[in-house]
């Protein structure tokens, strides 16, 4: 049988990425052009800046991805692209490039949900067994997803306010840490003690919903009040206390979901899945199901994960027309 090569595009936020997947599971290339340095001075992603950067580098990313994969444009079988959720301007750059490539070469266009990409990045570790449960944690999302089969995603719980990664970045900014702050907070947390009593919202409620706005506000108030009084707080202890509260919330809801949905596999994915503290808690506390976490290189935004997620869409012949548009608020269905 002739080999299949999927060329995948990811431009939902501040990473321009193009990847090539051979058949179902051989990632030949995964080129990522990061914009973090451009956004650091703003303390967050500036949509207009992100879009301009995507335009500047996407052609070079395509060329590099094909070269690294050792194939030519004529070898590509299909084109996959993130069409949401994300920043509308950023999404449109990737969509335009993907549609142009597919149209020029007469190839099918595969639409991929960005969060499905994060989830299916776990396929790079080992073949996934369904049904499974996934905890998706990133800068824009915190949700528990039940996956009955590849491509069938249902939200069973999600945040009511801030995403967990967003909370990390906001408290990081208060402490004067560099954006994005997640990795630095994680490192500092391992050097400090959990001595500050931060709230764990909804942790005892019998649902699968998350809330991080109260925790974020409590942190900011503590830090602000200490500054007003001229008191010095240990950054390491602040980080340790904040992270302990975050992980308590994530673990409580995840374990509750595993009780409600008896599955054999838990996938933990998204940018926050790179968090060392979270990985340690999962290893220690979730021992009765298989826990699969994508490798660090596939935790952040990348086109490799979009390629993995596109396989199930290819198998279902779920192809898009040339009128495919960006859907910045695209979401999985909610479990009824």
Swiss-Prot record:
Required for the formation of a threonylcarbamoyl group on adenosine at position 37 (t(6)A37) in tRNAs that read codons beginning with adenine. Is involved in the transfer of the threonylcarbamoyl moiety of threonylcarbamoyl-AMP (TC-AMP) to the N6 group of A37, together with TsaE and TsaB. TsaD likely plays a direct catalytic role in this reaction. Belongs to the KAE1 / TsaD family. Substrate binds at residues 136-140, 169, 182, 186, 275. The lineage of its organism: Bacteria, Bacillati, Bacillota, Bacilli, Lactobacillales. It is found in: Cytoplasm. Coiled coil: none annotated. GO terms for biological process: tRNA threonylcarbamoyladenosine modification. This is tRNA N6-adenosine threonylcarbamoyltransferase. It is an enzyme of class 2 (transferase). Binds 1 Fe(2+) ion per subunit. PANTHER family: TRNA N6-ADENOSINE THREONYLCARBAMOYLTRANSFERASE (PTHR11735), TRNA N6-ADENOSINE THREONYLCARBAMOYLTRANSFERASE, MITOCHONDRIAL (PTHR11735:SF6). Pfam families: TsaD. Its EC number is 2.3.1.234.
